Each structure stands twice: as structure tokens, then as C-alpha cells.
Amino acid sequence: MENNKEIIHESEVKELIIELRGEKVLIDRDVAKLYGVETKRINEAVKNNRDKFPNGYMFSLQVSEKQQLVENFDRFSSLKHSPVEPKAFTEKGLYMLATILRSPRATATTFAIIESFFKLSLIHIS
């Protein structure tokens, strides 16, 4: 996904969605990967727009949650000894993030994220 013009498919998003605290979320590093930016850019966007991310939009992982990620998902192994507290974005938080990140890649990624969460909600309802 290094090419900023690459189209993001719903299947790519779906396989990154995890459940924490009873909510389907994407972890900041996965969000960054989808948007084709560094994780620190996602976190800077949040920090610079804190008022757009109230409770329920995103949260920092507790140590035990971070440990759970490392143990259950190979893609998070680099977090094992990292002092960084990863952030989890809920569906609402991802929509808000989309209003901040502006680029053709961000627009395409947002469409894929919206479709993925919508389809997951349909599965949950059935």
C-alpha cells in the first residue's frame, strides 16, 4: 500500500477491524497504513483537533489491552516493548478523522472504511 493512488478494498479494512471494549475499532497504526501515512501523522491530526474526538470516538489502549493485541495479532509485535499507547478509533472516530485528512487517498480509504463497517453492522443484525 505504498502507492498513494492504490485503491483500498473493503476486505483489507475488514481484516484489520478488531473488537475492544465491546466496540469494533481500528488501531492507529492500521488506520495510518490504510491512509498511506505514518502513525504519528494520524496522532498529530487527533492532537491538533482534540475537540473533534470526544469520548466514544477514540481511546488510548490500557497496558493490558496493548498486551492482548501483541499476544493475539502478529502485526502488533513491534508494540511489545514500545512505550507508546496505541489509540483505537471507533466507527464515529474514523468518520471524524476523514473530515481532517484530505487527499484522494483519504477519500478512497474513507469509502472503504464506511462500506466495511456498514457491512459488518448488517451481519450483526442478521
Which residues make up each language-model segment?
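An anion-engaging/catalytic patch
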Residues: 1-117
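Conserved small/polar residues in nucleotide/adenosyl-binding loops
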Residues: 123-125
